[in-house]
Regions:
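The feature marks the mature, well-folded catalytic cores of soluble enzymes
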Residues: 1, 16-196
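Single conserved hydrophobic/aromatic residue that forms the stacking wall/gate
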Residues: 2-15
């Protein structure tokens, strides 16, 4: 059994991260072929990195996602001193130089990340670590992102973090999904548990 959660699909194209730890023994070409065979994808776009400190080892849905055919949302920061900047800039370069399976240039919508979000002492003391999870120490950075939302029939459920960027994230989703109601949901507790 191979782990393949590090992909996001838009019907005719797939975006993926090259995380060899998730698929030991398979080459990038073999993973690409499997994604095409099993998902019916015509093209795979490999991104060099994911969200900084993402403990899931590279779930692309916390970093980059298709929001419409030919349109990709990407986690972004303007802070060049933030380790996320290099990761997002590298992905932006790949995405802007890539055509989709229909030969169209990708439209990339950047959405500023929250934070950085760090764990408080109180939160650290309140987390019961279980086998296979990372410890939660006060001051540790969490991999918060607005990209990892749920898009359903008539609705988009969007994690928010009581952050100055929350309002812009809601506005971006409202613009991109005019036929859906955008529902902001506090995401910090989920983030503390290793998700988003």
């Amino acid at each position: 059994r191979r782990h393949t959660r590090s992909f996001h699909v838009t019907g005719v194209q797939t975006c993926a991260l090259p995380i060899s730890a998730r698929n030991p023994g398979l080459t990038q070409d073999e993973i690409t072929q499997n994604l095409c065979d099993y998902l019916g994808a015509e093209k795979v776009v490999w991104l060099p990195y994911g969200v900084y400190l993402d403990e899931t080892n590279g779930h692309v849905d916390n970093f980059c996602r298709f929001v419409a055919p030919g349109t990709v949302m990407l986690t972004w920061t303007d802070d060049r001193d933030d380790p996320q900047y290099e990761r997002s800039a590298a992905a932006l370069e790949v995405l802007r130089s890539t055509k989709d399976a229909r030969g169209r240039e990708l439209e990339v919508v950047t959405i500023h990340q929250p934070g950085p979000i760090t764990i408080t002492q109180e939160e650290s003391e309140g987390v019961d670590a279980v086998a296979g999870t990372l410890p939660r120490e006060a001051g540790d950075r969490l991999a918060g992102s607005y990209v990892n939302s749920y898009i359903g029939n008539g609705v988009v459920v969007l994690p928010v973090f009581d952050d100055p960027h929350d309002e812009a994230a809601v506005a971006t989703y409202t613009r991109l999904f005019p036929g859906r109601r955008v529902v902001p949901v506090p995401g910090r507790e989920i983030l503390l548990g290793g998700g988003n």
